[in-house]
Swiss-Prot record:
GO terms for biological process: translation. It comes from Staphylococcus aureus (strain MRSA252). NCBIfam families: PRK00504.1, rpmG_bact. The keyword Transferase does not apply. GO terms for cellular component: cytoplasm; ribonucleoprotein complex; ribosome. This is Large ribosomal subunit protein bL33C. HAMAP family: Ribosomal_bL33 (MF_00294). The keyword Ribonucleoprotein applies. Keywords: Ribonucleoprotein, Ribosomal protein. GO terms for molecular function: structural constituent of ribosome. InterPro entries: Ribosomal_bL33, Ribosomal_bL33_CS, Ribosomal_bL33_sf, Ribosomal_zn-bd. Belongs to the bacterial ribosomal protein bL33 family. The gene is rpmG3.
Amino acid sequence: MRKIPLNCEACGNRNYNVPKQEGTATRLTLKKYCPKCNAHTIHKESK
């Protein structure tokens, strides 16, 4: 398992690091709280 950073879709801020198994082809998307936007937004896996 690797730690993958998640970027906020709205502002691009890196807010979270989540574990992800290696070998999965799809990119992770989660709805999380962004303190900079002060709202729940979609966070996508960054490279």
